[in-house]
Amino acid sequence: MPQKVRIALDAMGGDIGASVVIPGAVISLNRHPDTEFLLYGDRTLIEAQLAAHPAMKAVSRVVHTDVAVAMHDKPSQALRRGRKTSSMWLAIDAVKKGEADVAVSAGNTGALMAMARFNLRTLPGIDRPAIAGVWPTMRGDSVVLDLGATIGGDAHHLMALAIMGSAMARVLFGLERPTVGLLNIGVEEIKGGEEIREAAELLRAMDLPQLEFIGFVEGDGIGKGAADVIVSEGFSGNIALKAAEGTARQFAQYLRGAMSRTLLSRIGYLFARGAFKALRDKMDPRKSNGGVFLGLNGIVVKSHGGTDAEGFAYAVDVGYEMVRYDLLTKINQTLNRHGHTTLASASAVQEALS
């Protein structure tokens, strides 16, 4: 376990860049003083932010580059233009070279995934990485993946997601056999596309020792905590994520309006202020910011591009905790024990079922 957690930040990533990244890192540093930062980006912009935060400046090293990946760049464009020179690439490369323990970026998701996959490579048996997040539910927390790394996927890919997600749940939640559900438009076995129905059939047939497959889960089942792990291909998973975050913000706005509408409601708010604060904190989507790229030989955390400093701080916290508690090593050990053999035999089972 490292004495200091070394975090490489893509300081130019996101909708705003350094003016969110640096203040966000400062908030995280206040929570985790045993952190050091490598900051990649425009030195002038970064140092202007650091000037207001001497404690952050004291534990940071700035590496200048004026090449930044735009939010609208296609992954192929980002690789051509920004490979080995962009702030995003350099942050990931620091992890590969052992100069940093984790890279955090709020930049272009497709470009970040392409660069991370190209530079860090995937683990044996994993064809495509996934973005996994931890969501608050009525029953506690659930691991949800894929949140947008890969659009679409066959039954074998969905099974790989189930195995990676269950490995993460075993480590994070201390579960021997996490429950796993496939996100679908209904719970009946006939519902959904061919790929998801094949994945369900495959998971039932294999009856894996490291996870308990419970079948299909509808969208409202995520918030209910219907399973410890919710699996979806990246398109649907990202829509579910954005819908949940939007609903949380909408609810908070409605609540603020209701509590300030009349004198009586304002008085009532004063008496229930503690309860409302707890509810607001629980539903704050910024606290769930920070998706972990699973399936790579290194830790990369993706923050929302449009988040504020507080939200980015939570993404940095995720990276810190992945390193401090050695979660990636533990997840990979679980995959090594169970995942690779399972995925290798899944194709044979799938062929037999067809």
UniProtKB/Swiss-Prot annotation:
Catalysis: reaction(s): a fatty acyl-[ACP] + phosphate = an acyl phosphate + holo-[ACP]
SUPFAM superfamilies the record matches: Isocitrate/Isopropylmalate dehydrogenase-like
GO molecular function: phosphate:acyl-[acyl carrier protein] acyltransferase activity
Broad enzyme group: transferase
Annotated pathway: Lipid metabolism; phospholipid metabolism
Keyword Lipid metabolism: yes
Keyword Lipid biosynthesis: yes
GO biological process: fatty acid biosynthetic process; phospholipid biosynthetic process
Keywords assigned: Cytoplasm, Lipid biosynthesis, Lipid metabolism, Phospholipid biosynthesis, Phospholipid metabolism, Transferase
Enzyme Commission number: 2.3.1.274
One Pfam family per UniProt: FA_synthesis
Disulfide bonds: none
Gene Ontology CC annotation, any one: cytoplasm
Subcellular localization(s) per the UniProt record: Cytoplasm
PANTHER family documented for this protein: FATTY ACID/PHOSPHOLIPID SYNTHESIS PROTEIN PLSX, PHOSPHATE ACYLTRANSFERASE
Function in brief: Catalyzes the reversible formation of acyl-phosphate (acyl-PO(4)) from acyl-[acyl-carrier-protein] (acyl-ACP). This enzyme utilizes acyl-ACP as fatty acyl donor, but not acyl-CoA.
Protein family membership: Belongs to the PlsX family.
Complex and partners: Homodimer. Probably interacts with PlsY.
Name recorded for this polypeptide: Phosphate acyltransferase
Organism: Nitrobacter hamburgensis (strain DSM 10229 / NCIMB 13809 / X14)
